Design a protein with these regions (language model features):
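A detector of single, family-specific signature residues
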Residues: 1-391
């Protein structure tokens, strides 16, 4: 057996190659993060191994720094094992009491872990392509968060420039109101606008939801508004709305790409009443291959939804808190999905109500419902069967 440990960095990668006895087959070496370096690593691995040797290549999950070398190794049909940095760090500390941590030591630690009896599963080509879905869902999440902050800015600016507007419309974040404020960013500008122009904007952009009488009400309110006349704030409002519109267009494009992947996957969890398309996509992207988890509890732990445990002598934690050490994206998707599933699925609605009746806080009861949902998701994805409602 030949075990290759790679410590990944931005500009270079440190490598260590051991045989089945743990003896270095070659001195630890460093390769640059480019194609010449990758080919040099591949050639060294081939020189150190025989055709009958089983080769294992291990590296840490270091985010985007490992994407390129991981793809190269998979393209060359090498079995790759991606490790949790927490595991490798603890394993390194268990090998020596000395506080020695260098890139080459880390590379040797990874290679040694491959030789041990640690339960590791190889990184499949399917998992590599699953990164596409993960990248898209995380990218969408960040864009939505960015847009939410800009919407808060719009609310703040409207409160300064035309505070009465919020009482006249169902939402100031609708397409028609954005169109109105883009052209007339303030009470003063609206009060001086021609009524026909105001009505045309509202009727056209709201698809008939608003009519001329709404334009009249808005202009009348603008003429008696207490809003400040601040050209700088009006300019900021116009630009902020433009940024929101651009972000919305980008989010729609991202969602189209996600939908294409989801249409190919046809995941069983979409059959759960209340399970949203976006939450399902993020859950699948973050978990990846469910066969990597031998129980639903492992999925919960990966999401950081497991309860922490502390016991020392007679002291035992009475109020255990959530670990929150896993994927924050998965944790967010699970809790968002649970809220909607509890609303639309009678079984989960009853379960949530039962937990609250036991005296549990809503968030605690929701966490119990999340565990129940994870068990259901795990069962559906493992079996490949759609959800069947209990009658």
């Amino acid at each position: 057996m030949v075990c290759v440990g790679i410590d990944v960095a931005k500009d270079k990668h440190d490598c260590c190659i051991l045989d089945s006895e743990g003896t270095p087959l070659v001195d630890c070496f460093t390769i640059p993060n480019n194609m010449d370096g990758f080919k040099s690593l591949l050639q060294t691995i081939q020189d150190c191994s025989q055709k009958s040797d089983k080769i294992k290549v291990g590296l840490e999950a270091t985010g985007h720094y490992s994407y390129n070398i991981l793809g190269f190794l998979l393209d060359n049909d090498l079995p790759v094992y991606v490790m949790n940095p927490l595991h490798t760090n603890l394993y390194r500390k268990s090998l020596s009491l000395r506080k020695t941590k260098t890139d080459r030591v880390d590379a040797k630690t990874i290679a040694t872990m491959l030789l041990s009896d640690v339960d590791l599963k190889s990184y499949t080509d399917t998992a590599y392509h699953n990164e596409e879905l993960k990248s898209l869902t995380r990218y969408r999440f960040d864009k939505v968060q960015e847009r939410a902050k800009l919407k808060q800015s719009v609310s703040r600016l409207v409160t300064i420039l035309f505070p009465e507007l919020e009482q006249l419309v169902s939402s100031i974040h609708g397409t028609s109101i954005y169109a109105l404020l883009s052209e007339y960013p303030g009470a003063k500008q609206i009060s001086e606008a021609h009524l026909t122009r105001l009505a045309n904007i509202l009727v056209k952009t709201s698809r008939g939801h608003y009519r001329k009488d709404k334009a009249t009400h808005i202009r009348d309110a603008a003429r008696t508004s207490i809003g400040s006349v601040m050209p700088a704030k009006s300019l900021e409002l116009k630009h902020t709305i433009k940024l929101i519109q651009e972000l919305t267009s980008e989010i729609n494009e991202i969602e189209d790409a996600i939908r294409k992947i989801m249409d190919e996957l046809k995941p069983p969890i979409l059959s759960i009443p209340g399970m949203g398309f976006h939450s399902a996509a993020m859950i699948l992207a973050e978990v990846g291959d469910f066969s990597n988890f031998n129980s639903p509890d492992k999925v919960l732990a990966y999401a950081g939804c497991s309860l922490s445990t502390y016991q020392s002598g007679k002291l035992t934690n009475c109020y255990a808190h959530m670990e929150k050490r896993g994927s924050r994206y998965l944790r967010y998707a699970l809790y968002t999905a649970t809220k909607y599933v509890c609303y639309w699925n009678p079984v989960f609605t009853e379960y949530l109500t039962k937990k609250q009746a036991e005296g549990k806080h809503y968030n605690v009861a929701l966490s119990h419902a999340t565990k129940k949902l994870v068990r259901l998701i795990y069962a559906l994805q493992k079996s490949g069967k759609a959800y069947l409602a209990v009658t």
